[in-house]
From Swiss-Prot:
EC number from the UniProt entry: 3.4.19.5
InterPro entries: Ntn_hydrolases_N, Peptidase_T2
Pfam families membership: Asparaginase_2 (PF01112)
Organism lineage: Eukaryota, Viridiplantae, Streptophyta, Embryophyta, Tracheophyta
Residues that span the membrane, as ranges: none
Species of provenance: Arabidopsis thaliana
Subunit and partners: Heterotetramer of two alpha and two beta chains arranged as a dimer of alpha/beta heterodimers.
UniProtKB keywords: Autocatalytic cleavage, Hydrolase, Protease
Class in the EC hierarchy, top level: hydrolase
Intrachain S-S bonds: none
SUPFAM superfamilies for this protein: N-terminal nucleophile aminohydrolases (Ntn hydrolases)
Stated name of the protein: Probable isoaspartyl peptidase/L-asparaginase 3
Amino acid sequence: MARSDVLIFVSTLLLFLSLLTVADAELVKSDKFPVVVSTWPFLEAVRAAWRAVDNGSSAVEAVVEGCSACEELRCDGTVGPGGSPDENGETMIDALVMDGVTMEVGAVAAMRYVKDGIRAAHLVMKYSQHTLLAGEGASAFAISMGLPGPMNLSSPESVKKWSDWKENQCQPNFRKNVVPANDCGPYKPNNSAMNVFVDKSTESCEMGAIEYKPPLVGPHNHDTISMAVIDRMGHIAVGTSTNGATYKIPGRVGDGPIVGSSAYADDEVGGCGATGDGDTMMRFLPCYQVVESMRQGMKPEEAAKDAISRIARKFPDFVGAVVAVDKNGSHAGACYGWTFQYSVQNPDMNDVQVFTVLP
């Protein structure tokens, strides 16, 4: 055999072996992917995301479909329209979507008159160079890009809840150090509560008569859906949607649209979703912490527990949870102050499975 023929044969053999290796790698990938992980037992939302990604949709597209299904179903009254009235009785929407490949993010906050939060966030990602739009500006953008609106986001249930709250002297609420303390506003600062007294004998400072209120957080007034999807190619995306805290002060933005707090994703590492007391959690960016801890070698469970413990050390009355998934599809959750459940579907499961995490 001529030298040139030998070279051609060897080159062909090497090419065949490389293609075989790629095919084997893709086969292995398809065995463990896709994966859908979501906070809480939002089964229909996970099924919607699974149908999309199992039929070839990208991770971003599947996240949008899953969170959108939860919005349409008004999951627990805390996602989508018709729930969580603020002090004025109005429902507003927070949402976020993040692509772990490009690190692009689209988000909307305190969005009025448009019910499709996750689709609005996706439009921000696709058709603007911004990361976050808020308030009526977010609404106008979403409507201009084709989403239905403006519309009233209240429901008979949310109106009734708000009316009952008003009859109960607007209690409980998220105000502090104001007068009146036990009735509806208008509110003014309680300056006497902000006086600082210095104890000369101990050199310590004490706040005079500052009112303490336990956190107004529970599974039915802070239920964010936060979802992570790994598609058939191993790419990851995350998304969140919520109508926020019930009886919040108008204009309040929770952690739902804050990247790194409610959700975070990086194709090189994995993703995270969070739920709970967003006003506290956004101060710690727990999902960014989870992903970075996994980058440093922590397993999902260890990373999730570490992120939650960082918050609990500073705020022992905090209530919240995170769910972590690494780039291989391994998942775990951690929580504090409540029992947490999260949902998963992958190729090894016939249907969605719910995992329970104890505090």
